[in-house]
Amino acid sequence: MKPGIHPDYREVVFQDMSNGFKFITRSTIQTRENIELDGKTYPLAKIEVSSESHSFYTGQQKIMDTAGRVEKFKNKFGVRANGKAK
């Protein structure tokens, strides 16, 4: 591999924002925040869903609020009163 063209592959803490679960893995993700864990400072990547909160792994149903997304879609791509798209 050519030196200087590849991103740093380092240990990063990923934090599930829905339940606070944290895990350390290696990644090239660029982050703005750091966190101290087990006496060592790591870059922090915040994620919405992990294996600790995803319904496939937990077996529990979770309702997601998509009303805002649906309204945004209808406003952007909805049909006008005359039947033609915007």
Swiss-Prot record:
Q: Please give the subunit comment from the record.
A: Part of the 50S ribosomal subunit.
Which InterPro entries does the entry link to?
Answer: Ribosomal_bL28/bL31-like_sf, Ribosomal_bL31, Ribosomal_bL31_B, Ribosomal_bL31_sf
Question: Keywords of this protein's UniProt record, alphabetized?
Answer: Ribonucleoprotein, Ribosomal protein
Per its record, how is this protein called by name? Large ribosomal subunit protein bL31B
Q: Which GO terms describe its cellular component?
A: ribonucleoprotein complex; ribosome
Q: Lineage of the source organism?
A: Bacteria, Pseudomonadati, Pseudomonadota, Betaproteobacteria, Burkholderiales
Name one process (GO BP) from the record: translation
**What organism is recorded for this protein?**
Burkholderia cenocepacia (strain ATCC BAA-245 / DSM 16553 / LMG 16656 / NCTC 13227 / J2315 / CF5610) (Burkholderia cepacia (strain J2315))
Under Gene Ontology molecular function, one entry of this record is: structural constituent of ribosome
Q: Which family does it belong to?
A: Belongs to the bacterial ribosomal protein bL31 family. Type B subfamily.
